[in-house]
C-alpha cells in the first residue's frame, strides 16, 4: 500500500506536465499501471480472475 502523502501529492496539479504519472486507483502503486483500467498489474489480475472487470477473461489457445 502506498503512503497516503504520496497519493495526495500525485493528485495535485503539477507545475510541469512531465512530472505527472499514473498510480493504481485501488492500491496506489506507481509502477506497471494499465492506463485503460487505472489499475496496477497485480490488482488487474486479481479482479480479472474474480470476474469483476467486464469483458476480461483469461486467454487460452
Swiss-Prot record:
What is the cofactor note? Binds 1 zinc ion per subunit.
What keywords is this UniProt entry annotated with?
Answer: Metal-binding, Ribonucleoprotein, Ribosomal protein, RNA-binding, rRNA-binding, Zinc
Disulfide links within the chain:
none
| GO molecular-function terms, A-Z | rRNA binding; structural constituent of ribosome; zinc ion binding
Spell out the SUPFAM superfamilies in the cross-references.
Glucocorticoid receptor-like (DNA-binding domain)
Q: What GO cellular-component annotations does this UniProt entry give?
A: small ribosomal subunit
Residues that bind Zn(2+): 24, 27, 40, 43
A Pfam match? Ribosomal_S14
Q: Can you supply a Gene Ontology BP term from the record?
A: translation
> Which domain of life does this protein belong to?
Bacteria
Q: Cross-referenced PROSITE patterns, in alphabetical order?
A: RIBOSOMAL_S14
Q: Which cofactor does it need?
A: Zn(2+)
InterPro entries recorded: Ribosomal_uS14, Ribosomal_uS14_bact, Ribosomal_uS14_CS, Ribosomal_uS14_sf
Record text on subunit structure and interactions: Part of the 30S ribosomal subunit. Contacts proteins S3 and S10.
* NCBIfam families, alphabetized: PRK08061.1 (NF005974)
Any idea what job this protein has? Binds 16S rRNA, required for the assembly of 30S particles and may also be responsible for determining the conformation of the 16S rRNA at the A site.
What family classification does the UniProt entry report for this protein? Belongs to the universal ribosomal protein uS14 family. Zinc-binding uS14 subfamily.
Q: What is this protein called?
A: Small ribosomal subunit protein uS14C
Protein species of origin: Bacillus licheniformis (strain ATCC 14580 / DSM 13 / JCM 2505 / CCUG 7422 / NBRC 12200 / NCIMB 9375 / NCTC 10341 / NRRL NRS-1264 / Gibson 46)
Amino acid at each position: 500500500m502506498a503512503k497516503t502523502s504520496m497519493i495526495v501529492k500525485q493528485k495535485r496539479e503539477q507545475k510541469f506536465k512531465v512530472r505527472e504519472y499514473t498510480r493504481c486507483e485501488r492500491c496506489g502503486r506507481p509502477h506497471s499501471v494499465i492506463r485503460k483500467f487505472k489499475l496496477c498489474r497485480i490488482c488487474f489480475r486479481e479482479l480479472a480472475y474474480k470476474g469483476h472487470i467486464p469483458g476480461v477473461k483469461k486467454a487460452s489457445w
